[in-house]
Amino acid sequence: MDPTQNTSAGIGGSNGTIRYQTNDGTSTVTVADDSKENLSQVINSIEKTLGVLHQLHLTVTSFTPASQLHLLQRLNSLVMELDNMTKLSEKCNIQIPMEVLNLIDDGKNPDEFTKDVLNSCIARNQVTKGKTDAFKDLRKHILEELEQNFPDEVDMYREIRASSAAVTKRLAQSQSVLPNGDAKVKNEL
């Protein structure tokens, strides 16, 4: 292959995007940027459609036989913009929960749904934290009881735990793994 040709290679980017870089060092648009651009185009089309609907409303409310041509032009403009919006929306893949759509249909604020979801997550997190704390307290209590009755075995247990933790920590550092199990990722800019 001729080295002067521009071939593309996919390079992993941050936050789940794919960045393509050519041999000459230039990079093309990311996948996330494409979806943002598509969404922006759909939003602009919706705004244009709303503007055309407003103009159509004004034309209809002040309709006279002489303004019939103007009304037909506005209707054609609305049909063209709705067609454009449909074509643009096919490029967007956005999933909206049915609960949000039902709230909108009921005339309620969809932010309430988001607030309720966050509050339920916080509540479940608190329950999980409570369970974790209860297990920590139980472990601490059992170790205290065992230490009173079997001090030598508890000392051996603590030595084994300490050496095991040290080995795990060294292994994690050598493999670039965070203590919580996540892998370290180098940012590519």
Curated annotation (Swiss-Prot):
Q: Name one GO cellular component term.
A: mediator complex
Q: Which residues cross the membrane?
A: none
Where found, per UniProt? Answer: Nucleus
Q: Which GO terms describe its molecular function?
A: transcription coregulator activity
Positions of the UniProt region annotated as Disordered: 1-22
| Oligomer and partners | Component of the Mediator complex.
How is this protein named in the record? Mediator of RNA polymerase II transcription subunit 10b
